[in-house]
Amino acid sequence: QKVEGLRHRQRLAGEEIAKKGRAKEDTTALKAEMKTVSEDIRSLEAELASVETALSNLMLMLPNIPHDSVPRGDASANRVVRKVGEPRPLGFEPKLHGDLGAALGILDFERAAKISGARFATLWGAGARLERALIQFMLDLHTKERGYLEIIPPYLVLPETLLGTGNLPKFEGDLFKTGTSDRELYLIPTAEVPLTCLHRDEILDAGELPKKFVAFTPCFRSEAGSHGKDVRGLIRQHQFHKVELVKLSPPEQSMDELEGMVSDAEEVLKRLELPYQVVLLASGDMGFGSTKTY
């Protein structure tokens, strides 16, 4: 308000100086006053910019508001919504997937570490074909039967893209950052980032919604906060492949669209005849940008 008041005074003084100039009246004192006003405005604008930046940074650190249906609490308050199928009794002690993959010669961590360091893997032969087949199966299911539009997005994104999805500034430590002489880019942690921002800064007609996108991409995460967590096998890798579903919808339809998206994901597990459970995460176990998560 103070800055606007000084700017208003400056505009009025400019008109007064012009008027006095036409009347051949002395404007020395008024010009001297306006010089002081201009200096005050510059000083206040710098202070205002600093305060606005600090306020913006604080607001960017605020998480999304949990939906009323979300249980309050930490991970112990997570709620099992439903269970589908039962695990088959194997009659023997199963191996960890990492050990099994290594024994079959389709998964190799040691050679990946030689190439890239820890938390990378190479898939060999049938392992590579299996992953490729699963990816194609999911893409075909979602595009041909569930109405999603397949997108191949960029794997490198601008900082403002990650700002728009809530990854920056809070989770910068979890991202891989690249730098060139002309710009700063980040490797995507999930296809959700570029898909969500496809229509950023656009006004969409309600009749176009919902928009349903599916994308297969590699994902890159530093997993800086995973110390002490299970990192065996293919868990918490720096690079992994994922088929992502994203919907853009009006806020009043978002919960229905979420339930539909959960159903779409469940269909994959049903057709693969894998037993599973759907868990509603508690507020303390949800992601920073989520209002409701299964």
Positions of predicted regions on the chain:
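N-terminal alpha-helical targeting/anchoring segments
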Residues: Q1-R88
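TRNA-recognition modules of translation machinery and tRNA-sensing kinases, especially anticodon-binding
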Residues: K83-Y294
